[in-house]
Swiss-Prot record:
SUPFAM superfamilies: IHF-like DNA-binding proteins. CDD domains: IHF_A. This is Integration host factor subunit alpha. InterPro entries: Hist_DNA-bd, Histone-like_DNA-bd_CS, IHF-like_DNA-bd_dom_sf, IHF_alpha. GO terms for molecular function: DNA binding; structural constituent of chromatin. GO terms for biological process: DNA recombination; positive regulation of metabolic process; regulation of DNA-templated transcription; regulation of translation. Signal peptide: none annotated. Coiled coil: none annotated. Keywords: DNA recombination, DNA-binding, Transcription, Transcription regulation, Translation regulation. It comes from the Bacteria. GO terms for cellular component: cytosol. Heterodimer of an alpha and a beta chain.
Length: 105
C-alpha cells in the first residue's frame, strides 16, 4: 500500500518542470521554503498552509514512564513535539471523496 517517497530532489525537479526556473534556482527555492518552515516551528510558531494543513508545535509536560524490562518508574522530561493536522480538503483528496470545499483548519 505504501507509495514511493518524495524527496527534496523530487520537489526541486517539480519546481524546475512546472515553474521554469533553472535547476539551481529551483533547488534554492525549495530549500528556502523548507528552511522558513523549520525556523518557524523551532520558534514555536504554527505553520498553516491553506488547503494542505497545519504544522503545530505542542508542549508535552513531564510524566512518569516505566522501563518495560524492569518495571522501574522513570521520569520522562518535558519536551516539544510537532504535529501535522491535515486540512479537510487534503483529507478528501487523499480519500478520493468530494468535500464541501470548506477548510476546517
Amino acid at each position: 500500500m505504501a507509495g514511493r517517497t518524495v524527496t527534496r530532489a523530487d520537489l526541486c525537479e517539480a519546481v524546475y518542470q512546472q515553474v521554469g526556473l533553472s535547476r539551481t534556482e529551483s533547488a534554492q527555492l525549495v530549500e528556502m521554503v523548507l528552511k522558513e518552515i523549520a525556523d518557524c516551528l523551532a520558534r514555536g510558531e504554527t505553520v498553516k498552509l491553506s488547503s494542505f494543513g497545519s504544522f503545530v508545535v505542542r508542549e508535552k509536560g513531564e510524566r512518569v514512564g516505566r522501563n518495560p524490562k524492569t518495571g522501574e518508574e522513570v521520569p520522562i522530561e518535558p519536551r516539544r513535539v510537532m504535529v501535522f493536522k491535515p486540512s479537510s480538503i487534503l483529507k478528501h483528496r487523499i480519500n478520493g471523496t468530494v468535500g464541501d470545499g470548506l477548510d476546517e483548519d
